[in-house]
Structures are given as C-alpha cells and as structure tokens.
UniProtKB/Swiss-Prot annotation:
Glycans are attached at N41, N54, N63, N97, N234, N268, N277, N307. Keywords: Glycoprotein, Repeat, Secreted, Signal. This is Saxitoxin and tetrodotoxin-binding protein 2. Homodimer or heterodimer of PSTBP1 and PSTBP2. It comes from Takifugu pardalis (Panther puffer). It is found in: Secreted. Residues 1-20 form the signal peptide. The keyword tRNA processing does not apply. Sequence repeats lie at residues 24-202, 203-391. The keyword Transmembrane does not apply. Its main location: secreted. Binds both saxitoxin and tetradotoxin. May play a role in toxin accumulation and/or excretion.
Length: 391
C-alpha cells in the first residue's frame, strides 16, 4: 500500500486526539534557558499551574491541590521557598538556595535543601539541579533533576494565575515543552484556578486586592506618601525602627528606576532615614528589587548591603500599599498620599480593607502600626501651621 499523504495523516491524528511531536526548531525556541546573567527575570511569587514528573516518589505529585513558589535574589544566590498544599489541607514546604558559577551558566545547583512538615524541619537529601525557561510573559517553567527523578513545573506569576480559560489554552504549549525535554506525558497536575495555598487564600476578593503595579505602570506610585497602617512578620520587635511614630516616603521615577527616600520618626523623637533605588526587568514584571541602600541615624550614615524585593498595590485613589520582603523581615506598608492622610475617621474605616489585604498576602495580624493622623514627620510637620489673620 502506498504512503499515506501528509494531509490525510494529520486529519487522522486530529480525529484520534493525537498531536504531532513538536518540530526541532519549535523545541529550540521553547527550551531557551535563562542564564545566570538574566536570572532577575525569575524573581517573584509564582503559582504552579501545570506539572508532569518522571519519579519514583509519587507522594510528591499525588493529592496535590496547589503549589506556591517564591524566588528571592540575594547577591548571587536565589532563595527558594516552595509551599505545597495537599488534599486534607496538609502542607509540605521545601527551602533551598540555588546557585550557579558563571554568568553564562544555565544550570543552578540546589544547596541545603530542607523539608518542613507539621512544623518540623529536616534535611531533604537530594542532589538536584534546576533549569529555568521563560516561555511567555508572566510565565516561568522549571526543570528539576535530582536523585528522586525529573519534574517539569509550569508557573504563572501570582496575580495572573486564576484565569482558567487562559490556563486551559496554554496546556498544549506546556505539553510541547514536556515532549521537547523528553518527558513522558502521563497524568499531569493541573491547577483549578481557585484552590487556596498553604500560607494564604486565593479568592476573587484577594485577586482584586492584590493586583500588582507592573514596571510599565510604575509612574502611578510616584509622589509623597504617609504610612497609615502596617503589619510585619519574621521581624525582631527589639529593633528600634519598629517603634514608629510616623513614616513619610518619597518615591521618584527616573528612567525606570524608583528612587525611595523614607523618613521614620520613632517614639523617642529620633529619626531614621532609609534611601535606595529599585529596579525591575521586563515591562510586565511586578517585583522590584534593590541590592543596597543607605541608612542614616543620629547623623551617621551606614551602608546596607541588603537584598530586598518590593511589590506595589494600588487599592484605592490616593492609596498605595507595599509588600516588602528582605533582611528586616516581611512587612506590609499601607500609605495615603501626603495631604489626604489626616482624616482619622476615613483612615479608621479603611483599616478593615488593609487587614483583608494583609490576610490575602499571608500575614498573620498581630499588633499593626496605626497612624494617629496628627504626628509630625522627621523633616516637616504633619500639617502646615495656620498663620494668624492680620488686622
């Protein structure tokens, strides 16, 4: 019998639900790795939306309902936190540092991998390596290879992970990448778009509150801001800078760089000033990074070799919220634009919304800082003095 014409073969494959294997040139495009020199692009918070594994450790894949990953850059190290929620609301977290030697290296090694389950942290002995692939805007793919097997993990940036139709349309591309990397497609994990995470919820209300400001729209954060509400985690209460009376922040945009000048007045009327520059990668990126800063206290300048990440949220007109993660811990700052920061009743009414945002971001609400509406700032009074009328 003669050869089956190509068109007929394609029609047969379509009827049978079988997809042709991706062409080599398509694989070359899909498997372009992220180098160490460009690793800033992976920084941020990510939600697992699709995954396939060739492993003997099936417990890692079975009964998974959600997986949330944070990548934080610290000098040449990527700090990696993965939180996995399983059926029955049990959580297993993994912590590690990823490193690569040269700027052109595309493979990252895992160091000091640890697993936490039911509050108990123990070493997880697996010699693993990771490769990253950027397959679309706000997408990240990660190939993990170790003693326990191989995993392909497809992520969407937190905040754009809930559109089920978009995720469904992207599955074919995910399967192509898996085939290009030599994975056998068995029963992939597929995120349902609504399941919560170990450390925070993923409801529609949170989706609205936690819509981040991207680099393309960062001009909107420019201006002078007054801190009106704040909550912190993993932070030492003995730090003097936590004993706030008022905090005034100036944000200026210069060619894509955010210049921050923060003046904190403490309860003993001493002042502490912090200055830094923040940058982001692509226009769509919503995580801003700084690698150094300068702190001034009692007239003494101190260089801070600190790596931190910041996300901005615009929750209302003349409002700005900042989610900070870094050396000082994890802090949510809620601001009002200078000039509309003194109406105590309005600020009090907005506290419930601030608390909702904090809960959506995974904060446990302890004793928040609440601005009293009248305290002065380091460099100026909270409101201009009223001059007496002239006769």
């Amino acid at each position: 019998m003669g050869a089956v014409p190509g068109v007929v073969l394609l029609l047969m494959l379509a009827v049978l639900g079988i997809r042709a294997a991706p062409a080599p040139e398509e694989c070359h495009k899909l498997t372009k790795p992220v180098l160490k020199a460009d690793v800033q692009n992976v920084s941020g918070d990510w939600v697992l939306v699709w995954s396939v594994a060739n492993t003997t450790e099936r417990w890692i894949c079975e009964n998974l309902t959600s997986s949330y990953v944070e990548f934080k850059l610290h000098s040449d190290i990527i700090e990696y936190t993965e939180r996995n929620l399983f059926l029955g609301n049990s959580c297993i977290s993994f912590y590690s540092n990823l490193s690569a030697s040269t700027e052109k290296q595309q493979q990252f090694s895992l160091n000091n991998l640890q697993m936490e389950e039911k509050g108990v942290v123990r070493p997880f002995n697996d010699n693993g390596t990771v490769k990253f692939f950027e397959t679309c805007v706000d997408c990240l793919s990660m190939e993990y290879s170790g003693d326990i097997g191989r995993f392909l993990l497809i992520y969407r940036r937190d905040g754009v992970h809930q559109n089920v139709e978009v995720l469904k349309a992207a599955r074919d591309e995910s399967q192509k990448l898996a085939e290009c990397l030599g994975f056998s497609i068995d029963e992939p994990f597929i995120y349902d778009g609504v399941s919560d995470f170990c450390h925070k919820k993923s409801p529609e209300e949170c989706h609205k509150l936690t819509k981040p400001v991207t680099k393309a729209d960062v001009q909107s954060v420019s201006g002078d801001w007054v801190l009106v509400w704040s909550v912190a985690e993993n932070i030492s209460t003995s730090n003097e800078w936590t004993k706030l009376k008022s905090s005034h922040v100036e944000l200026r945009i210069h060619s894509g760089v955010i210049v921050l000048n923060e003046r904190n007045m403490l309860k003993n009327n001493s002042c502490m000033t912090f200055k830094t520059n923040m940058t982001a990668g692509p226009e769509s990126q919503n995580t801003f990074i700084y690698t150094s800063g300068k702190m001034e206290e009692n007239g003494v300048d101190k260089e801070l070799d600190e790596n931190g990440t910041v996300k901005f949220f615009e929750t209302c007109a003349d409002c700005l919220s900042i989610d900070y993660s870094g050396l000082f811990g994890h802090v949510l700052f809620v601001y009002r634009r200078d000039g509309v920061h003194q109406n105590v009743e309005v600020l009090k009414a907005a506290q419930d919304e601030s608390q909702k945002l904090a809960e959506c971001l995974g904060f446990s609400i302890g004793e928040p800082f609440i601005y009293d509406g009248v305290s002065d700032f380091c460099h100026k009074k909270s409101s201009p003095e009223v001059k007496p009328e002239q006769d």
